[in-house]
Amino acid sequence: MYKLKALNFLKKQLTRLKVVDMEASCLYIYKWSRMIRKIESDDNPKASAGSTSAKGVYQFTDASVQTAKNRMHNMGFFKEDIREISSNPHNWTNEQADCMFLANMFAQKGSDKLLGKIAYGDLDAMKEAYYKFHHTNPDKATIKRVDKLMVI
């Protein structure tokens, strides 16, 4: 399960979304994020895309790091915690990576509806949110990998 900062953030968001079963909903979001880590990088913090600047477990690009930090700030994370996050995703702790991922997801316009469904284990919503808010231009190989690894 997520560590303290990521888990506290997630619980605040799920409370805002009025989920019924907090424990189960946290677990579904956690499992979904682990599937994304596996799809993106085989859960390797030192992974690099090669063809883009994407790196780390969630494959944040150089350009998306500052955007995610801004979203963390807008979503209520402490400035000190944000400041401690390197601009290089290879250097992130698991908790920093998870906080960046969660804030980046929950801050995006239109994400609440899909994240609310993910909190109840909706696999179609998991895939849709992944394609809409994280990997916005998947090739056939990525789609095949998602279909193989994103399972409940």
Model feature map: region roles:
Residues M1-S87, C99-K113, Y120-I152:
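Cell-wall polysaccharide-cleaving catalytic domain and substrate-binding groove, primarily
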Residues W92, Q96-A97:
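Mid-length scaffold segments of soluble, non-membrane domains
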